[in-house]
Amino acid sequence: GMPKHKRWVLLANWNDRTLMRNAVAFGIADVFRNTLSGGMEWNPSGQFVELVYNGVHVGNYYLCEQIKIDGNRLDINDPLDDKDNPYTGKPEVFGYLMESDDGYDEAWQFTTANYVPFLLKDDANADMLEYAQGFVRGIEDLLYSGNYDTAYEKMDLASFVDFLLVQELMMNSEMAHPKSCYSYINDGTMYAGPLWDFDWNTLPVSKTYSENSYDFTKSMLEDAVKSSGWFSSYK
């Protein structure tokens, strides 16, 4: 079962005629977490329900956990732990849940030098925004300048590997113009995840679309067969 909580989401999956894509993506992440070391620490879980409202059946929904900082959800340092005096202390002691989404619909947000949007999902202040922005931009600068080892010291690579594997297996094209791509900073490290929003632009049915647009998946699987590169540890 799922941990007790008062906040839940009813996903309509209205863009997905199979109603299954979100559940499949979350299921793949569960397999990774249960069989591999490291990786994404938490992703939403849920179950399908038939919703009846005022005696009227209104359809099939996916009842699942909401993405939020919480001991029974994403368990990272919560700026609101001190209810009477929140957001006190140095910015680096807080956990930051972020979403890369070109909808820019949060109050606290920033963009990297390469135009990747990051939206803070919780209320913040100017010092917290400055810290999160500096941390993420610092990693991006290191990667683009070829200082990979230094950048990797600030990243949980296993979570990024698992996150990207799920995106590739689901053939999610929305990473190109990011929608609902979550990440977070906690205790001086940046993590990928949790997963969200796979009911649109995933597992395309067009043969031409899949063959022409996902050559990386083919090369990734070839790496697995040859036991070369980073993929060998995940075979």
How would you label these PLM feature ranges?
Residues N15-T18, V56-V58, Q66-D70, G103-D105, ...:
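Solvent-exposed loop/turn segments at secondary-structure junctions
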Residues H5-R7, P44-F48, H57-Y61, V93-L97, ...:
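Extracellular structured ligand-interaction cores
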Residues P3, T18-N22, W42-P44, N125, ...:
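Active-site-proximal structural scaffolding
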Residues I28-S37, Y53, Q66-G71, D75, ...:
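A generic secondary-structure signal for well-formed alpha-helical elements
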Residues N13, L63, I69-M170, M220:
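ATP-dependent phospho-/nucleotidyl transfer catalytic cores
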Residues M2-N60, G138-S159:
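A conserved hydrophobic secondary-structure block that centers on an alpha-helix together
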Residues A124-A126, Q133, D187-K235:
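C-terminal catalytic region of ATP-dependent kinase domains
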Residues K154-V205:
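Active-site acidic catalytic loop and adjacent metal/ATP-binding pocket
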